[in-house]
Amino acid sequence: CIRDRVSVGMFEHVGTAHYQEFFNKVYDLLNDSGVALIHTIGRLNEPGNTDPWIDKYIFPGGYIPALSETVSRVEKSGLSLTDVQVLRFHYAETLKRWRYNFYDNIDKVKEIYDEKFCRMWDFYLSSSQASFEESTLVVFQMQLSKNKKTVPDSRNYMLA
């Protein structure tokens, strides 16, 4: 039985103090032939700080990792990093569409939330889109396995 695991949009909420625990748990959950995919917002440069406004109003306790912060923890867990994909502009487009959808439904939103929330959410979506377009924010997809022979040598298998 192959046990594959996927984590989407969760790793940025784990916190650096728990990275090793996270990857150790991924290792424990995989069979010897299992593969894990970790999909997370990340930064292309060195580790940094979370924007204070984002931390206070949008993602309390969240942290955007640099790839350099994760790889050493992957290695210590016994997992092999078998592939990394860096999606540079995809999430900017996602945020842009979310903002359009937000305004397409603004009357419904205002029935539930006040004006302050609406302004904050617009600011979050707009500033995040700009960050993905103009700064070092990206999305990483890390493919991990216990056994590097489990994963094909190229990405051609994804096209089948």
Tell me what each language-model feature is.
Residues 6-11:
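A conserved beta-strand element that flanks and buttresses the S-adenosyl-L-methionine
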Residues 41-152, 159-160:
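Substrate-binding/catalytic lobe of Class I Rossmann-like enzymes that use SAM or dcSAM, i.e.
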Residues 20-35:
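A short glycine-rich, Lys/Arg-flanked "PGG" loop and its adjoining helix->strand segment in the class I
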Residues 1-2:
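Short, small-residue-biased leader/transition segments that mark boundaries at the very start
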Residues 19-22, 38-40, 46:
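Serine-hydrolase catalytic core recognition
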